[in-house]
């Protein structure tokens, strides 16, 4: 079964697109986790500051 160069190129491009999409998806998941961690840190900082302000009053 000999394929023409154009169909081979199309298969290569499709595989490359699949790879890019999967990498992109993993990057998005990693970014979401990073954002959640940052939000948790910010929340804990805000809560501790609020507690400090209340204790000063």
From Swiss-Prot:
Name under which the protein is recorded: Non-structural protein 3a
A Pfam entry, by short name: IBV_3A
Signal peptide: 1-23
BP-aspect Gene Ontology terms: symbiont-mediated suppression of host innate immune response
Top-level taxonomic group: Viruses
Keywords carried by this UniProt record: Host-virus interaction, Inhibition of host innate immune response by virus, Interferon antiviral system evasion, Signal, Viral immunoevasion
Protein's job: Involved in resistance to IFN.
């Amino acid at each position: 079964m000999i394929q023409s160069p154009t169909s081979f190129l199309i298969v290569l491009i499709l595989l490359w697109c699949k790879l890019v999409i999967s990498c992109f998806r993993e990057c998005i998941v990693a970014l979401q986790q990073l954002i959640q961690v940052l939000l948790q840190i910010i929340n804990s900082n805000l809560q501790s500051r609020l507690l400090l302000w209340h204790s000063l009053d």
